[in-house]
Design a protein with these regions (language model features):
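Extended, alpha-helix-rich binding/interface surfaces that flank or overlap catalytic cores
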Residues: 3-66, 72-77, 81-92, 98-173
Length: 173
């Protein structure tokens, strides 16, 4: 399969998932369900002016899914430092509570312990603003982010908790 064919299939799948009634989502495999809900929530958020407005456009359970998935994507892509540096200002204050709501208590404790130990105010991440790659490196060296990241990577993926959460609340997605 060439790249163009793959991308066309992916676009068709995304279109299908956006139009699919919530009740039909339950028939999808776990992987497809997770992808479908990711597409659906991101589509709602992306249609808004900014992340704050996008979060407000989601219902409570969609917001939980979006915020926890956002954390996992950022940490898996570049670590907790990247999560704080990127546009997580609206999401970071929600993460701890939402981790608990999906049953990810080990990850919740890791997150809470890290921000408490290093006095990180998740309601004001302006100290994490960066302009360059050098700024990112400086941020990365402020705290022992590898300590958090290494522990996080050894835990059950948040996707597993989120998929279960979606199945339990399928009508909200």
């Amino acid at each position: 399969m060439n790249l163009n064919h793959f991308l066309k299939q992916l676009q068709e799948k995304e279109t299908l998932y956006l139009k699919m009634p919530s009740a039909d989502l339950s028939s999808l495999s776990d992987a497809d369900l997770f992808y479908a809900v990711t597409i659906r929530t991101e589509n709602k958020v992306d249609a808004c002016h900014d992340l704050q407005e996008g979060l407000a456009a989601l219902n409570d359970r969609q917001r939980i899914f979006y915020a926890v998935n956002y954390l996992e994507v950022e940490v898996n892509n570049g670590g907790l430092c990247q999560f704080f540096v990127n546009a997580s200002r609206a999401v970071a204050p929600l993460v701890s509570e939402y981790l608990g709501m999906i049953g990810a208590f080990e990850q919740q404790k890791l997150y809470d312990d890290f921000i408490v130990k290093y006095h990180i105010d998740v309601t004001d991440l302006s100290s994490f603003d960066i302009e360059s790659f050098e700024d990112f490196n400086a941020q990365y060296e402020r705290y022992p982010f590898d300590e958090f990241d290494d522990a996080f990577y050894k835990m059950t993926p948040l996707q597993d908790y989120l998929t279960k959460f979606v199945r339990e609340n399928i009508g909200d997605f």
